[in-house]
């Protein structure tokens, strides 16, 4: 199934957003509406009294076929804060270990009354397959599909950028560093940044870890990390996706850190008020040092807290009127 078809599956017959499968095909206005809702959630804080009943009586399920800390638990907290009943699916303890397909798993849970599915799967196509079989009134949210898409991560990163740098991205210089080829975060972020009118996007990493499918069209691309740091406003550090990589793409972790690890000395080359982002999990001493990850220019924990607020916004937008 091609990307255009998946994009169209997100909308109902009236053009209303029904699922969140990818940020591709979503308008600037739609992204800004989601970000504005998330910003309102930030203003309400961790105990949003006025939103406790938005999803009251509704069952949602975190249907994860891959490990997760931040995404799974932030979705769980987001749904709870909106009053939903949350089911946490454990693939290792389910009938998928007996051969049941993801589609059959979803349809059975749907028959029990679950109306919102938050899905992570290592195979990109499965998200589209699930969207094709869900019933009317059931909502599907992509929580990470293979190496292709992670829409809510990109949304929380955009919210963090707004907080750090304001709402106008047109003059920003942003640098993505690391394993771009296997990163669903990088792909979704690049689509969001283009839709929101980002200024200069730079990409840096070993040649073997850069995609050659047109994703980097319009980006400034280099293997020279030190040169690319000059004047950068935002650094997005990405981990090596070793679970998706072929052996031998990187000589060693030590070699990678020497060439692409963000240290305090390297960070000093960027703009004085540059901010550092990382979607997690962090591999300390590989793509980033402790000093930088825990330093004053790190917005990494803000990303984590924003994850709850963004995912609340997505849930209430899609399920609040379901």
Swiss-Prot record:
One GO CC term on file: cytosol
Disulfide links within the chain: none
InterPro entries documented for this protein: Asp/Orn_carbamoyltranf_P-bd, Asp/Orn_carbamoylTrfase, Asp/Orn_carbamoylTrfase_sf, Asp_carbamoyltransf, Asp_carbamoyltransf_Asp/Orn-bd
Keyword terms of this UniProt record: Pyrimidine biosynthesis, Transferase
EC number per UniProt: 2.1.3.2
Cited Gene3D superfamilies: Aspartate/ornithine carbamoyltransferase
Entry keyword annotation includes Nuclease: no
Reaction equation(s) it catalyzes: carbamoyl phosphate + L-aspartate = N-carbamoyl-L-aspartate + phosphate + H(+)
Listed pathway(s): Pyrimidine metabolism; UMP biosynthesis via de novo pathway; (S)-dihydroorotate from bicarbonate: step 2/3
Binding site for carbamoyl phosphate: 70-71, 120, 150, 153, 280-281
Sequence positions that bind L-aspartate: 98, 184, 239
The UniProt record lists the keyword Transferase: yes
GO biological processes: 'de novo' pyrimidine nucleobase biosynthetic process; 'de novo' UMP biosynthetic process; amino acid metabolic process
Highest rank taxon of the organism: Bacteria
GO function term, MF aspect, one: aspartate carbamoyltransferase activity
Stated role: Catalyzes the condensation of carbamoyl phosphate and aspartate to form carbamoyl aspartate and inorganic phosphate, the committed step in the de novo pyrimidine nucleotide biosynthesis pathway.
PANTHER family per the UniProt record, alphabetical: ASPARTATE CARBAMOYLTRANSFERASE, ORNITHINE CARBAMOYLTRANSFERASE, MITOCHONDRIAL
Assembly information from the UniProt record: Heterododecamer (2C3:3R2) of six catalytic PyrB chains organized as two trimers (C3), and six regulatory PyrI chains organized as three dimers (R2).
Family that this chain belongs to: Belongs to the aspartate/ornithine carbamoyltransferase superfamily. ATCase family.
Protein known as: Aspartate carbamoyltransferase catalytic subunit
Top-level taxonomy: Bacteria, Pseudomonadati, Pseudomonadota, Gammaproteobacteria, Lysobacterales
